[in-house]
Amino acid sequence: MRIAWDLFVHDSQLRWLGPEKGVEHMAIGAVLSALWDIKAKRAGKPLWLLLGEMEPEELVSTLDFRYMTDALRPEEAVAILKEGQKGKAERIKHLLEVGYPGYSTAPGWLGYSDEKMVALAKEETQVKGFKQIKLKVGQNINDDLRRLSKAREAIGPDVRLAVDANQVWDVPTAIDWINKFHDFDLAWVEEPTSPDDVIGHATIARAINPIKVATGEQMQSRILYKQYLQANAFGIMQIDATRVAGPQEIVLEYLLAKKFNKPVCPHAGGVGLCEAVCHFAMFDYVAVSGTMDGRMIEYVDNQHEHFVHPTEIKDGNYVAPTAPGNGTEMTLETAEKYLYRG
């Protein structure tokens, strides 16, 4: 797997298109994800279990530490994974029995009326069992304050409430806006400004404490994660299963998060993202962080019908996949319908 990584990521001509960022990097990620899917299927294991049961030295040998050793060295990664072997069997058993916490974005879209938002907030928490919901914010401060007040009243004090600005603010505006949210006991504010602005996020994080900054779904490489962590620029780290170059880079990001003691709450929601990203959160629980505390996976209830093994939710938790592979195999009907035929 390391040979495949080096072949694509460090190709001297492909690097002119990046390096290690953008569509080129995401395309490499698709190829490497397919290779890991094949490896997991040959082993007869879901990807999370394949990764979780690999020997530390073997897994670390697949990772690329170029540009990373000022933050994480290979021997540190091996030590983290060896420490993660303690209690692994019990965590696998717990994961298969209980699942992994999810949270719902369903109530939060800006186009919804207050009545629809409140009804969905109650349904997602009281009926479906989610312990956190997330609302979009950033268009109008008065609308945000009203909607947050109604949402908090609807879900009560024991359900977590997060907000997502989708990069809409500059740094001073973010600080001013978010500091009006302190009464709502927010779990985090997501993507307050440009995902490339490490210093801006660090400035916001200091200014809005104790509200936590969450970001990461748009980060284009492990190198940017390294800088965010070194700058203490967020409280909650997020990943996306398709933004970077496949499982090897995502595993390295989780190891970085462990080194810097940051919880990871993955982004999901697009076609296949729930199916894909849950494997990495579960791998983290089994083999890296060893905990679900402060960790959950985003869930959006659409587009799952396109997959052979769609995501299952039970009592607000992701059911651990047991089918071999990475979970993103599409049905034949969908593949034939949407195949690009040139």
Predicted regions and their residues:
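Flexible, glycine/charged-enriched surface loops at secondary-structure junctions
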Residues: 47-50, 188-192, 267-268, 291-294
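N-terminal capping/lid subdomain adjacent to the active-site entrance of alpha/beta enzymes
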Residues: 1-161, 166-175, 179-183, 303-342
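Flexible C-terminal active-site loop/helix
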Residues: 248, 252-256, 269-342
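Residue-level recognition of hydrophobic positions within alpha-helical transmembrane segments
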Residues: 28, 33, 186-187, 236, ...
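Short, charged helix-to-loop "capping" segments that act as catalytic/coupling loops
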Residues: 110-115, 126-129, 206-210, 286-294
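Catalytic core of soluble alpha/beta enzymes
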Residues: 126, 134-275
